[in-house]
């Protein structure tokens, strides 16, 4: 699990700055659209092929080996944006199914899922954090004075780590295909059966709100690392925090550190607030985060930028994890897996795809022919996702009426951030 998310964290927070530094700033949003495309395709691969015919650890190994080779080819395509993004797409088509496979393998080989899996899953978040710190403290020694985020080193790191994990996967405990011999349909893979069973006004409001709130979220994943570079490192900010987090990707790990801390507070907050207020707090934190970025931009106010990154723990835990708990409580055992898969499809698939495209178009509209937005332009960029998230929050507050205030069970997020 550590390597599973180390791999993702090594490239996901650096690819935008790398593309901006190599004449591809106008295409920097595209990796954040091909990733959701792969998230949409992954359930079909898992449901129709991987879960029915092959041992989980073998599929995991093969996909990581293919993905590692593809990622090692990516830097060589730097001069050709189309080929560069196409290779990123192929890589993601290999990687995204491994998220479900890794969870499936873990669940099959533990006896108490509620107690043991969260302890395993937390190593994924740690792996993401270590990836950012590795880039900041290790790769910086080999980047010839440049920010390592702008060099191909993180991409090579991802490729090598993928190959290592691919080889290691074959040594994992044998895990037979969980769906062998069972009928499967497109309806069950997409989650239509679960949607019909869970259908209620409050559930539909939750699903639509989840999709809509992921549209402004895409701006954070795609452009917060670039904003951190422009607003912190390009202006030469030097303090105790930048000495500990010396590059954008390491600074962004503050969000995952915050996520881990707020995860510990969730049971207490859930008892006090219930589902609706927890979800509203998460949405409100997104509005506040983008507002802080907008206020920080004109004068590159470091602590406002850091505060916005630290809010990621509230943004992610209070909305996504709470949402998973809500879906879990609404579901029967027969459709629970379908329901969670449908939530991932709607959020990390459709929502993030739409959001990535919109964020890229807006960013390029501000940027024009320049390489980066100016600080003044960033101050105009961030209020847009803030306003969008604010509208979704207000509509959710008005129309979401849960029948009961469900209490939490253990839940695990499909992604670290």
Which residues are covered by each model-predicted region?
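A membrane-interface helix-boundary motif in multi-pass transporters
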Residues: 137-160, 361-389
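Juxtamembrane intracellular "pre-TM" segments in multi-pass secondary transporters
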Residues: 172-208, 233-240
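C-terminal ends and interior cores of transmembrane alpha-helices
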Residues: 65-79, 284-298
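Hydrophobic core of transmembrane alpha-helices in multi-pass small-molecule transporters
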Residues: 2, 70-71, 81-101, 105, ...
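Multi-pass alpha-helical transporter architecture, strongest
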Residues: 74-78, 161-174, 381-417
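Cytoplasmic membrane-interface "Motif A"-like loop-to-helix N-cap segments
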Residues: 51-65, 271-283
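Central cavity-lining transmembrane alpha-helices of secondary-active solute carriers
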Residues: 30-50, 250-266
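Helix-loop boundary and gating motifs at the non-cytosolic
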Residues: 1-39, 203-209, 213-240, 244-251, ...
């Amino acid at each position: 699990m550590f390597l599973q998310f180390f791999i993702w964290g090594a490239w996901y927070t650096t690819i935008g700055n790398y593309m901006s530094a190599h004449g591809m700033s106008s295409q920097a949003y595209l990796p954040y659209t091909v990733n959701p495309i792969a998230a949409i395709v992954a359930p079909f691969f898992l449901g129709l092929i991987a879960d029915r015919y092959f041992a989980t650890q073998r599929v995991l190994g093969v996909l990581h080996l293919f993905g590692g080779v593809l990622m090692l080819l990516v830097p060589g395509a730097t001069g050709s944006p189309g080929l560069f993004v196409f290779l990123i797409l192929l890589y993601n088509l290999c990687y995204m199914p491994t998220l479900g496979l890794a969870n499936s393998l873990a669940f099959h080989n533990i006896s108490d899922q509620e107690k043991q899996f969260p302890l395993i899953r937390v190593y994924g978040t740690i792996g993401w954090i270590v990836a950012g710190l590795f880039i900041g403290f290790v790769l910086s020694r080999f980047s010839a004075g440049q920010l390592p985020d702008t060099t191909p080193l993180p991409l090579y790191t991802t490729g090598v780590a993928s190959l290592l994990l691919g080889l290691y996967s074959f040594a994992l405990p044998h895990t037979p295909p969980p769906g062998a011999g069972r009928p499967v349909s497109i309806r069950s893979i997409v989650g239509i059966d679960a949607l019909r069973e869970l259908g209620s006004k409050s559930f539909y409001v939750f699903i639509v709100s989840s999709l809509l709130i992921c549209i402004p979220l895409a701006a954070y994943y795609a452009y917060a690392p670039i904003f951190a570079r422009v607003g912190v490192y390009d202006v030469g900010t030097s303090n105790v925090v930048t000495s500990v987090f010396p590059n954008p990707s390491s600074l962004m790990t503050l969000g995952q550190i915050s996520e881990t801390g707020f995860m510990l507070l969730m049971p207490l907050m859930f008892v006090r607030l219930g589902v609706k207020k927890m979800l509203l707090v998460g949405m409100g934190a997104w509005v506040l985060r983008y507002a802080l970025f907008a206020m920080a931009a004109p004068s590159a106010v470091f602590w406002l930028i850091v505060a916005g990154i630290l809010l990621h723990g509230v943004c992610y835990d209070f909305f996504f994890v709470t949402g998973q708990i809500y879906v879990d409580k609404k579901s029967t055992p027969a459709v629970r897996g379908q329901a969670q898969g449908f939530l991932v499809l709607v959020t990390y698939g459709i929502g993030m795809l739409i959001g990535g495209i919109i964020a890229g178009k807006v960013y390029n509209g501000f940027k024009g022919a320049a390489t980066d937005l100016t600080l003044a332009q960033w101050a105009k960029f961030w209020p847009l996702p803030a306003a969008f998230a604010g509208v979704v929050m207000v509509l959710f507050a008005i129309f979401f009426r849960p029948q009961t205030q469900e209490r939490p069970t253990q839940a695990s997020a499909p992604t670290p951030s």
